[in-house]
């Protein structure tokens, strides 16, 4: 939200997991979409998850930008026909992903499911556990990890799950914040 406000971009937050009726949204009225994470699985039989995938496909047809983070990336993957599957062991905490250019990036993971490669997508990030990020068509990016977090958010997520996380220095997260800013600017400006 901070980046959008700095750019003069109006944002509207919908919480379909709490009953916000996204199935009633007109995709033609939406300039772009960011789909964030959550504790549910994209494989759960929930009406709002299905409606969100329809919205993602509709925005793609309109060439509108979509950024998916964690569950959001999995929603993009499933919306276009690839699989999301349970990992043998969840990825939780700070870890490293490797960009296709060979650069290493420290990121925060909090997921127990992984994505199959979406046919036609460009891999952006991977690690030894799974596909971690991709671009699809011109205006869609999915990231399995969280670049939007702060040290305080990481501590709160760990505490809420009764899985305390080691303290994280802001400097460790700064390169990820810069990558996120570049993605937002590419998609939404």
Question: Over which residues does each language-model region extend?
Answer:
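Cysteine-nucleophile active-site neighborhood
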Residues: 35-100, 104
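Amide-donor transfer/coupling interface in amidating biosynthetic enzymes
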Residues: 98-189
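N-terminal beta1-alpha1 cap of cysteine-dependent amidohydrolase-like domains
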Residues: 1-64, 159-189
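Conserved beta-strand segments of alpha/beta enzyme cores
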Residues: 10-12, 83, 106, 122
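Short amphipathic alpha-helical segments
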Residues: 1, 45-48, 80-81, 120-121, ...
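Short loop/edge segments at beta-strand edges and connector loops
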Residues: 15-18, 86, 109, 125
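Short loop/helix-cap segments at secondary-structure boundaries that form the rim of catalytic
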Residues: 1, 23-28, 76-78, 116-119, ...
């Amino acid at each position: 939200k901070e980046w959008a406000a700095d750019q003069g971009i109006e944002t509207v937050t919908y919480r379909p997991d709490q009953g916000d009726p996204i199935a009633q949204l007109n995709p033609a009225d939406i300039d772009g979409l960011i789909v964030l994470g959550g504790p549910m699985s994209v494989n759960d039989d929930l009406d709002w998850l299905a409606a969100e995938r329809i919205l993602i496909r509709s925005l793609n047809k309109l060439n509108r930008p979509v950024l998916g983070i964690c569950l959001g990336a999995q929603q993009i993957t499933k919306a276009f026909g690839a699989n999301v599957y349970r990992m043998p062991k969840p990825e939780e905490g700070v870890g490293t992903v490797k960009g296709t250019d060979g650069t290493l990036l420290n990121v925060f993971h909090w997921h127990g499911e992984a994505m199959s490669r979406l046919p036609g997508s460009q891999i952006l990030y991977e690690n030894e556990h799974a596909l971690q990020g991709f671009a699809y068509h011109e205006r869609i990016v999915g990231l399995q990890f969280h670049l939007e977090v702060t040290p305080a958010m990481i501590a709160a997520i760990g505490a809420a799950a009764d899985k305390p996380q080691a303290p994280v220095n802001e400097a460790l997260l700064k390169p990820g914040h810069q990558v996120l800013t570049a993605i937002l600017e590419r998609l939404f400006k």
